[in-house]
UniProtKB/Swiss-Prot annotation:
Further details from the record: Partially overlaps YML090W.
Induction behaviour: Induced by calcium shortage.
Record's protein name: Putative uncharacterized protein YML089C
Length: 122
């Protein structure tokens, strides 16, 4: 059973996913979106705060090191795969290059979102 803070992070990410999928349904292929960027940064800040407060003692904050207040999200929608997959995954590309790429993958690749990014035991 996940810790309370893991559930909170996953719930926040789920809201982000809903926004992402809403845009994808409209077939809007774009490089960035202020709404998605703001939501992602809010989620990132929440993760960082929980880590600092000790609520997530085992976290290895990869995203927190890469993202800053001025970070933009680069959203890429592979149009040839849009109909065959249903769930996005955040790929952490580089600590020194804080651009985030969203790819669409099968749900079971992302069901433990916090474990993927933070290397936390399930």
């Amino acid at each position: 059973m996940p810790h309370a803070w893991q559930s909170c992070i996953f719930d926040s990410f789920s809201r982000f996913v809903e926004l992402f999928l809403a845009y994808n349904k409209q077939r809007l292929y774009f490089r960035s979106s202020p709404l998605l960027t703001a939501e992602f940064l809010r989620l990132t800040n929440e993760m960082q705060e929980r880590t600092k407060s000790g609520a997530a003692p085992n976290a290895r904050v990869l995203i927190g090191q890469a993202l800053g207040a001025e970070t933009r999200c680069a959203l890429q929608f592979p149009h040839d795969k849009a109909k065959t997959v249903s769930f996005p995954r955040i790929i952490h590309t580089s600590i020194t290059n804080p651009w985030i790429k969203l790819s669409l993958v099968r749900p079971y690749y992302t069901f433990l979102f916090s474990c993927m990014l933070y290397k936390i035991d399930p």
